[in-house]
Amino acid sequence: QWSSSAASDVYKRQYRNIIMTNYLELLYLISFTGILAVAYSYLLSGQILSSSAGNARMQEIAEAIQIGAKAYLNRQYKTIAVVGIIVLAIVSYFFSYLVGLGYFIGAFLSGVAGYVGMLISVKANVRTAEASRQNLQSGLTIAFKSGAITGLLVAGLALLAITIYYIILINLNVDNREIINALVALGFGASLISIFARLGGGIFTKGADAVSYTHLRAHETIAD
C-alpha cells in the first residue's frame, strides 16, 4: 500500500498533467497574443520615429526636453533599483527563490515598459506638434499611437511573463501554493515599480511646471 504522501504526489502529478493537457494550447495562445502586442508596439514606434520632427528650432527644444527626461529616468531608475533589490532580498529570504524570481521578472518587465514608453512619448511630442501644423487628424494619430505603445507593452509583457513563468513552474513540478506565491510576487513586482514611476513622474512634471513659472516671473531666481 502506498503511503498518504506517495499517493498525494501521484495525485499532484496527475493533476498537473490534466492541466497541461487541457490548457497548454490556451497558454500558448495567450503567449502569442502577448508577442503580437509587443510586436505591434514596436511597429508603432517605428512609424512615430519615422515621421517629421519639425524645423530646426522645434528639434532644438525637443532635444533639450529629451535630455532632461532621460536624465530624470536614469536617476529615478537608480533609486528604484536600490529599493527593488532590498525588497527582492526580503521576498527571497522569507519565501523562496522562485517567489523572488517571480518578483524580479515582474519588476524588470514593468521597468522596461515604463522606460521605453516614456522615451517614445517624449520623442512623439515634437512630432505631434509638427503633424498638427498640417491638420489635427495627423497630430491626433501620432499622439494616440504614442500612448498606445505603453499600453501595449504593459499588456503584452504581462501576458508573456505570467504564462511563460506559469508553464515553467508547472514543468518543474512546483507545489500549487508555491506557484500562486510566485505569480502573486510577479504582479507585486510589476505594481511596485509602476507606483514608483507614477509618483516620481508626477513630482517631476509638477517640478517642471514650477520651474517654468518661476522662470517667467524672475530669471535670476531660477537657480534657487
Task: Give, region by region, the residue ranges found by the protein language model.
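Hydrophobic, small-residue-rich transmembrane alpha-helices and their short perimembrane loops
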Residues: T21-R217
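Single conserved hydrophobic/aromatic residue that forms the stacking wall/gate
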Residues: Q1-Q14, H215, I222-D224
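Short, strongly hydrophobic alpha-helical membrane anchors
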Residues: R13-Y23
